[in-house]
């Protein structure tokens, strides 16, 4: 999965998919009442990027739905996964359940079209703090209450705070999550970070007894870091330059070991070599 980083305007969906992304990451800001408000990152952000792209969240969802609905004029067949990076800094911990509820209602109406031929992409809810685990509970219970529990098959989870993996496991236990888990690791492209925690996450994924199904590393812009990530056997690379990821995947060392995921690849299944 080649995950285009910080895709916060509708034009950027076309731009990043055009460069080779089959997945995008979108930042979601919340208002004081825990309503998802904008797709917006803000300052500071990755080096070499404009931090200010912003779209009303529901308008973004409608455009994203068009981009992932077969037959639509804006449809991109290869866009199959969307990571919502939930920027919860404006929320108190006790608003997590509310935020999950409101996020679910927004997605149900504007992305899934109330279950009537909505967008088909898989969705990852990426949460920055473990103590916001009730966001997952609120999201799941809302879809169940609205009669659309089936859509949870399309939803996965990530805690993005680079916490100790055993602590991540505990948070999922509290939230009742037993699958559909991606584990992110990374840092802004302005700084360097080693691969030791990525390797620990991959080991958990491959142990057969851990909770992790997939691992992605962010933000990977350099060719050398891309190779290091692939050598560590990650499932996803989040990048500002998807064309570089595509280029490296075509190198002799990688083209027989990796391929770009399609809609038929289940993002919640751990890959077995």
Curated annotation (Swiss-Prot):
Cofactor comment text: Binds 1 Mg(2+) ion per subunit.
Broad enzyme group: lyase
GO CC annotations, alphabetized: extracellular region
Lineage: Eukaryota, Metazoa, Ecdysozoa, Arthropoda, Chelicerata
Protein's name according to its UniProt entry: Dermonecrotic toxin LvSicTox-alphaIC1aii
Main location: secreted
Pfam families: GDPD_2
Species this chain originates from: Loxosceles variegata (Recluse spider)
GO biological-process terms attached to the record: killing of cells of another organism; lipid catabolic process
Localization terms from the record: Secreted
Active site: 5, 41 (nucleophile)
